[in-house]
Structure formats: structure tokens, C-alpha cells
A protein has these predicted regions:
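Histidine-acidic metal/acid-base catalytic patches
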Residues: 2-76, 141-142, 155-156, 202-203, ...
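Active-site acidic/histidine proton-transfer and metal-coordination neighborhood
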Residues: 21-31, 41-43, 115-231, 241
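Active-site mouth loops of central-metabolism enzymes
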Residues: 54-64, 112-124
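Short, hydrophobic beta-strand segments that form beta-sheet elements in well-ordered domains
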Residues: 79-85
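Active-site-adjacent beta->alpha loops and helix N-cap segments on the catalytic face
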Residues: 90-93
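Short hydrophobic/aromatic-enriched beta-strand-loop microsegments
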Residues: 99-108
Length: 318
């Protein structure tokens, strides 16, 4: 496994290559992430953006870090959280002075398949969400993830017929209202995620069949719940694919945004020069809007994960 010094050398090598190919001006336009790498490696961050590492990305791909390694890296880079971690592993986070910025909802299998849009799953989703809320309240962690679910009548069977969006969103409002009061009482926020349905190349790069794929419609639906503890997980990668105009939409929906995710597009890879999203500008907009939630780094590593994370954390540290 590559240590921090090796990662730093790799990044400096990339800087030299980029300068040769693109020139110093182009490198600066990309956010000038590389020259600041040493500060990120030492955990010296500005702190205007509270950053988090999404555990599954680095546990399932690349070097397949365990929770201990991921927590060590998060701490070394100045991140405050490792998220979507099972409560059984929260002790490791606390040992390193970290939080779980957003907790899993406890649904078995792919948790985004069976959600609030389908009444046949309401009992299980609500019960498991309440259990996750309890765990977060006990640990002092801020939020729990939620999903609309797939649009099929039977989430496992695309031939079972579709739930129309209006009906599905009405079901979401009804289901979320059943748990909103509990979340308010416990002081934990439910953050429902918008996902893209366009990318069908990889099971975690896109989610064809997911009902909540229009960020504007999802935001409007969540406002109908009318609870300060029911908000949206604004995933920049998914929004860019489905709707675009990310910076304007941040301002449009800041009232309902409770959590933010990143990844490079196309490909859900690193936040580097091979993708199209201008993360420094987006982070500056979040600061301008006084966003005080967390930003989770949720890219799937295609090269050395420490190098990619160091670059991403630095890029977003505006």
C-alpha cells in the first residue's frame, strides 16, 4: 500500500507532466490542487468545507481499505468524517476523533432499490430508518440516508409495472411524514438522495430505474414533507449527469440540501483533469451560501487511492 510520501511524489510527478502538456496557466485553471498537496497530507486545511470520505468507495475498490485504514487517512488529510459506515464500526471512527456524517439506513442489499416511493416497503424502510436514527442520536451523528427507490411495483422485477412519478412522490411524502416527527424529536436529519439513471455501465455509476432522478422534482417533493429534518443529499456527480447547471441549482435548492457528495464525471472517478466538473467553483458557492453540512468524497478510485483523495481534498479546500 502506498504511503503518504510516495503519494506526494506521484502527485508532483503528475504536476510536471501536466505543466509540460498544458502549461502552468492550464494547471492553475484546474484548481491548482497539486502545489497544495503537502498541506492536505498534514491535515492542514482551511476548514471552510467540512469534508468526509465515503467508506464504500475505498473499501470496495482500489486497495480495499478497511475502516481503520480509511479513518487513518481521513484524519491525516484533515477530513472530519468517514461516512456510510455500519454502526458496528463507529467505535473506530470515534477513536480517531471522527464522525459518521451520514449513516446507512440499514436496508439489506442495494439500499437504493426499495424506498419511500413504494408502500409495500414502507414498514421495513421506516422501521430501519428509525433504528438508524436512534443509533445516530446515541452517537451524536447528524444524519441518515434515504432513497425514493426503484419505480417498479416490485423493485426486483422490472416487468412488474411502473409506479408513475406523481404517485411515487406522493408515496414518498406520506412515508417520510411518518418518520419526520421521530427525526425531529431525535435531532437527526433524513437526507434523501437524487441519483442518475443515464449511466448503465456500472452498478454504482448509475441506477436505471431509480425514481428520484430529477433533482428539481426531488427537491419539490421533499419541501412538501415540511420538516426541517427531511432534506436532500445533493450528489454533484448525479446532478451534473441528469440536470447540470450545478452552481445555480445549489442556490435554488440550498433550503433543502442537507448533505453533498462529489465524484468526477464522466466515470465517477477522481476529481482530476480528466473530468468536467469545476469543483473549486462549486465549493466556493457552497461557502458563499453558508452551507455548513458535510461534503463526502464519493469517487471510485482508478489509481492510487491516497493520491486521488489527497488531490480531491485539496481541490475542495477553498
Amino acid at each position: 500500500m502506498t504511503d503518504q510520501n510516495s503519494a506526494s511524489q506521484g502527485l508532483m510527478g503528475r504536476r510536471g507532466l501536466l505543466k509540460s502538456a498544458l502549461g502552468g496557466t492550464a494547471l492553475a485553471a484546474m484548481g491548482a490542487a497539486v502545489p497544495q498537496t503537502h498541506a492536505a497530507e498534514k491535515g492542514e486545511v482551511n476548514g471552510n468545507i467540512r469534508q468526509s470520505i465515503v467508506f464504500w468507495c475505498f473499501n470496495a475498490a482500489g486497495d480495499k481499505w478497511d475502516i481503520e485504514k480509511t479513518a487513518q487517512v481521513a484524519k491525516s488529510l484533515g477530513c472530519q468524517s468517514v461516512e456510510l459506515v455500519d454502526p458496528s464500526q463507529w467505535g473506530t471512527l470515534k477513536k480517531h476523533g471522527l464522525v459518521c456524517a451520514i449513516a446507512p439506513n440499514g436496508m439489506p442489499g442495494a439500499p437504493f432499490m426499495k424506498g419511500f416511493n413504494n408502500p409495500r416497503y414502507h414498514e421495513e424502510v421506516i422501521t430501519r430508518t428509525k433504528s438508524a436514527i436512534d443509533a445516530c442520536a446515541d452517537a451524536g451523528f447528524p444524519s441518515v440516508i434515504a432513497f425514493t427507490g426503484f419505480k417498479w411495483r416490485d423493485a426486483d422485477d422490472p416487468s412488474s409495472g411502473e409506479i408513475p412519478q406523481e404517485e411515487g412522490f406522493d408515496n414518498c411524502v406520506k412515508g417520510l411524514k411518518q418518520v419526520a416527527g421521530y427525526a425531529e424529536k431525535k435531532g437527526v436529519t433524513i437526507c434523501l438522495e437524487h441519483l442518475n439513471t443515464r449511466d448503465d455501465t456500472h452498478p454504482m455509476k448509475g441506477h436505471p430505474g431509480y425514481q428520484g432522478d430529477d433533482v428539481d422534482a426531488v427537491a419539490d417533493m421533499l419541501r412538501r414533507v415540511g420538516s426541517p429534518r427531511v432534506k436532500m443529499l445533493f450528489d454533484i456527480y448525479h446532478v451534473q449527469i441528469m440536470n447540470g447547471d450545478v452552481i445555480r441549482r445549489l442556490g435554488q435548492h440550498m433550503d433543502i440540501i442537507g448533505h453533498v457528495h462529489t465524484a468526477g464525471n464522466p466515470g465517477r472517478g477522481e476529481l482530476d483533469e480528466n473530468q468536467e466538473i469545476q469543483y473549486p467553483a462549486i465549493m466556493r458557492k457552497l461557502v458563499e451560501l453558508n452551507y455548513d453540512g458535510y461534503v463526502g468524497q464519493e469517487f471510485i478510485p482508478t489509481r492510487d487511492p491516497l493520491e486521488g483523495l489527497t488531490q480531491a481534498v485539496t481541490l475542495c479546500d477553498v
